[in-house]
């Protein structure tokens, strides 16, 4: 039968190459390490109390004054107070206009009687009469002479315990503080030429603008603020004040190093990232009350924005990783609302945004180092989606929000329709935000995260602002572009190709002839015949089949087969009700029973859920038992073969994923049958189950105990023509007992006879199975 292709892939899934073996051995290799706990093994506690230690203060404190500056000689700026802070007695400062004014300031410590002291002023040894009667304050004395050979005369004094004095040039005058703290005030004494007046300071000093004279007065009377007295304040040369502050440009290209052929360029750029999510909402077949999948998909987005007056064209690709799978099942009836799987991103998820623009920074982005980025956070809020049911009120999924925070940046490659682009991949970690999401008219509410149903909330895009910097090794000749080696790119985005291929596969269902499909399903398809009809792949069948087998090895079907033996016996023994009416006839009362799988006791809410699990295992048992009857896997393999031959987009890269997905997703609504003399038991993956007589198709109570015994030893058959279809066929056309038995056993010859006779019931059933072969 056609399902032979799946069996071959499973039996040969061990095929691999030596590099895969080496990698697998490396990942599985373990080392036993013995840890000696030492003397703490008895108590588990250390013998001392551990504290947090010193807690550093992270408060940023900045100096409030312009200074201090090192002692020097300078032409004091006009309209600036020169606040001098000496630490010991003696000469403090001196100055002159070189024509008719020479002045000097000395500091006298407390408790000094009237005495003569020698100072070096204007290069000469000078004897000056000084005194300080105060026991707490220091005394600044200002001396002035009018000629080079004249005598210094005392003009003014300032007494203060803080050892601070100050003067200023303004309006061709010298202003000075006089008096005693805390009542010292400013006054002027000299008329000078501002342009030629130099001051030589012997102590550290500060510069205070005239507009802050009140602050200068406060310092003279009360002392400097505490931050200025700390040892962490280091005086600098006055020349540093002349350095102009140049604000670095956010968008600039800096040459780091350069040779004849190559140069290192540092690119600093501000950036605006706009992105949006894409999703896929797939509705199941049937009456229109079921949804099979709601998932995130990669999304490309192109836009323009202005950077430093230049219009930039940018391209982003948004994808997610680490999604959480949720489901909702409103009941077992065909008219009960259900979602088999919908994806939600939460704290354990990541969002990737690949960014590229047409600026020079991305022109030669091949050899890159020192890559860094700073980005703002963004909140992504979910919108509403109404599930349109054929009858009744529509459930609405709404709400949900996450906050994206930058978690790093790496290099990546984007694949557009025409070209591959080396780009930056910005990685964002997630934090859930208000509000939570819920589904109206259901019990599902108060769940946090962003569901895939409407992640953009009808917004055109999400936007993040920030900046990045990188150093790139580029050719010295700016006109030359470094070639991109596709063989060593970081990421190959095949999701777009797979998405287009899935759409094509789903659209090809209407082009499949039902009669030819039955013939193809009865053929023993092997790997060569499966792939031989595909264009441009015949010469690469060997390598392609190896890739297919490697991918098939990790499929859910392959994993389930390996656990078949243990799961079958345990799942079969889980159903404990002795006599229950068929679920297609009446609604079951909820019963609490137990299902033990792999030594894990799980609580099941109703019998239909158990039957669904048993039916999934029945598929595995039928799959491993090859018979002459037609199975669902034969039909799905035949549909796969037909679509592969008709496809124009299939390639060696997409083939493994398509074949693995087909084994998992084709014909999701399957029913399996066990025939016991004149009684048939039929169970579905959707939880439905029937028991009926073979000759009359009349329903009878479902004997669970009998069913438990049969599923262990009796052959399992695919219910290609299910019970409802058989009963409808018998009621409208009438069939013989022989035809009934052959249809119950899915005899391909009998099926083809009904199809060739244009029986609408059988034909519609097969067409419905073909329509369920979707990806």
Curated annotation (Swiss-Prot):
The record marks 231-232, 241-242, 247-248 as: Cleavage. Residues 510-775 are annotated as: Spike foot. A motif (YGL motif) lies at residues 448-450. Residues 389-409 are annotated as: Hydrophobic. Residues 248-479 are annotated as: Spike body and stalk (antigen domain). It holds the Pfam family VP4_helical. Keywords: Capsid protein, Coiled coil, Disulfide bond, Hemagglutinin, Host cell membrane, Host cytoplasm, Host cytoskeleton, Host endoplasmic reticulum, Host membrane, Host-virus interaction, Membrane, Outer capsid protein, Viral attachment to host cell, Viral penetration into host cytoplasm, Viral penetration via permeabilization of host membrane, Virion, Virus entry into host cell. The keyword Transport does not apply. Residues 484-511 form a coiled coil. A motif (DGE motif) lies at residues 308-310. Residues 65-224 are annotated as: Spike head. Gene3D superfamilies: 1.20.5.170, 2.60.120.200. The keyword Membrane applies. Disulfide bonds join 318-380. GO terms for cellular component: host cell endoplasmic reticulum-Golgi intermediate compartment; host cell plasma membrane; host cell rough endoplasmic reticulum; host cytoskeleton; membrane; viral outer capsid. One of its GO terms (biological process) is virion attachment to host cell. It comes from the Viruses. InterPro entries: ConA-like_dom_sf, Rota_A_VP4, Rota_VP4_MID, Rota_VP4_MID_sf, VP4_concanavalin-like, VP4_helical. In group A rotaviruses, VP4 defines the P serotype. Some rotavirus strains are neuraminidase-sensitive and require sialic acid to attach to the cell surface. Some rotavirus strains are integrin-dependent. Some rotavirus strains depend on ganglioside for their entry into the host cell. Hsp70 also seems to be involved in the entry of some strains. Belongs to the rotavirus VP4 family. This is Outer capsid protein VP4. The lineage of its organism: Viruses, Riboviria, Orthornavirae, Duplornaviricota, Resentoviricetes.
């Amino acid at each position: 039968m056609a399902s032979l292709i799946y069996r071959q892939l499973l039996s040969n899934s061990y095929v691999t190459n030596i590099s895969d073996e080496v990698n697998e051995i490396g990942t599985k290799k373990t080392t036993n390490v013995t840890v000696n706990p030492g003397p703490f093994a008895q108590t588990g506690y250390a013998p001392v109390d551990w504290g947090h230690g010193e807690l550093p203060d992270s408060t940023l404190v900045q100096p409030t004054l312009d200074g201090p500056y090192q002692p020097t000689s300078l032409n004091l700026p006009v309209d600036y107070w020169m606040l001098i802070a000496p630490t010991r007695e003696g000469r403090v400062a001196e100055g002159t206009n070189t024509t008719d004014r020479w002045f000097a300031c000395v500091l006298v410590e407390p408790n000094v009687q009237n005495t003569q002291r020698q100072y070096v002023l204007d290069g000469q040894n000078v004897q000056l009469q000084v005194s300080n009667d105060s026991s707490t304050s220091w005394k600044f004395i200002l001396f002035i002479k009018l000629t080079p050979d004249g005598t210094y005369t005392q003009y003014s004094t300032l007494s203060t315990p803080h050892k601070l004095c100050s003067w200023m040039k303004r309006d061709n005058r010298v202003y000075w503080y006089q008096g005693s703290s805390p009542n010292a005030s400013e006054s002027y004494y000299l008329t000078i030429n501002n342009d030629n007046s130099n001051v030589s300071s012997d102590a550290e000093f500060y510069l205070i603008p005239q507009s802050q004279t009140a602050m200068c007065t406060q310092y003279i009377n009360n002392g400097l603020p505490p931050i200025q007295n700390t040892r962490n304040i280091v005086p600098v040369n006055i020349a540093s004040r002349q350095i102009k502050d140049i604000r670095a440009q956010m968008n600039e290209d800096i040459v780091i190093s350069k040779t004849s052929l190559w140069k290192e360029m540092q690119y600093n750029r501000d950036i605006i990232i706009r992105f949006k999510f894409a999703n896929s909402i797939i509705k199941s077949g049937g009456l229109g009350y079921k949804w099979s999948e709601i998932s995130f998909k990669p999304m490309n987005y192109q836009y323009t924005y202005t950077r430093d007056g230049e219009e930039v064209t940018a391209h982003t690709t948004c994808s997610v990783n680490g999604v959480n799978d949720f489901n909702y099942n409103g009941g077992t009836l065909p008219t009960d609302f259900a979602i088999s799987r919908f994806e939600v991103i939460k704290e354990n998820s990541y969002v990737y945004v690949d960014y590229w623009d047409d600026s020079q920074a991305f022109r030669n982005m091949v050899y890159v180092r020192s890559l860094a980025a700073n980005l703002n956070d963004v909140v992504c809020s979910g919108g509403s989606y109404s599930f349109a049911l054929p009858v009744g009120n529509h459930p609405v999924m709404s709400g949900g929000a996450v906050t994206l925070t930058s978690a790093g940046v790496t290099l990546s490659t984007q694949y557009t329709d025409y070209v591959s682009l080396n780009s930056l991949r910005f990685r964002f970690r997630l934090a859930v935000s208000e509000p939570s999401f819920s589904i109206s008219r259901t019990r599902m509410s108060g769940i946090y995260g962003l569901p895939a149903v409407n992640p953009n909330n009808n917004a055109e895009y999400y936007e993040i602002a920030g900046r990045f910097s990188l150093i790139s090794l580029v050719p010295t000749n700016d006109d030359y572009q470094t070639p991109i080696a596709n063989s060593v790119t970081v990421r190959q985005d095949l999701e777009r190709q797979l998405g287009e291929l899935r759409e094509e596969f789903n659209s090809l269902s209407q082009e499949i002839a039902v009669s030819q499909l039955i013939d193809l399903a009865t053929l023993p398809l092997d790997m060569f015949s499966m792939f031989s009809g595909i264009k441009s792949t015949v010469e690469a069948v060997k390598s392609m089949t190896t890739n297919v087998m490697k991918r098939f090895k990790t499929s859910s079907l392959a994993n389930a087969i390996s656990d078949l033996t243990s799961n079958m016996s345990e799942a079969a023994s889980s159903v404990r009700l002795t006599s229950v009416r068929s679920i297609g006839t009446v609604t079951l009362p909820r019963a609490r029973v137990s299902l033990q799988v792999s030594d894990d006791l799980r609580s099941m809410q109703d019998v239909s859920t158990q039957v669904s699990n048993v039916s999934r295992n029945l598929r595995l048992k039928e799959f491993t038992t090859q018979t002459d009857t037609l199975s669902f896997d034969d039909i799905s393999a035949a549909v796969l073969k037909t679509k592969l031959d008709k496809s124009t987009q299939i390639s060696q890269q997409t083939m493994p994923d398509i074949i693995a997905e087909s084994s998992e997703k084709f014909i999701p609504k399957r029913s399996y049958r066990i025939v016991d003399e004149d009684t048939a038991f039929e169970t579905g993956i959707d939880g439905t189950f029937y028991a009926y007589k073979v000759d009359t198709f009349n329903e009878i109570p479902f004997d669970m105990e009998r069913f438990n015994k049969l599923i262990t030893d009796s052959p399992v058959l695919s219910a290609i023509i299910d019970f409802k279809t058989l009963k409808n066929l018998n009621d409208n056309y009438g069939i013989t007992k022989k035809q009934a038995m052959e249809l119950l056993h899915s005899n391909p010859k009998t099926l083809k006879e009904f199809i060739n006779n244009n029986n609408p019931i059988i034909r519609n059933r097969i067409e419905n199975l073909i329509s369920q072969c979707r990806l």
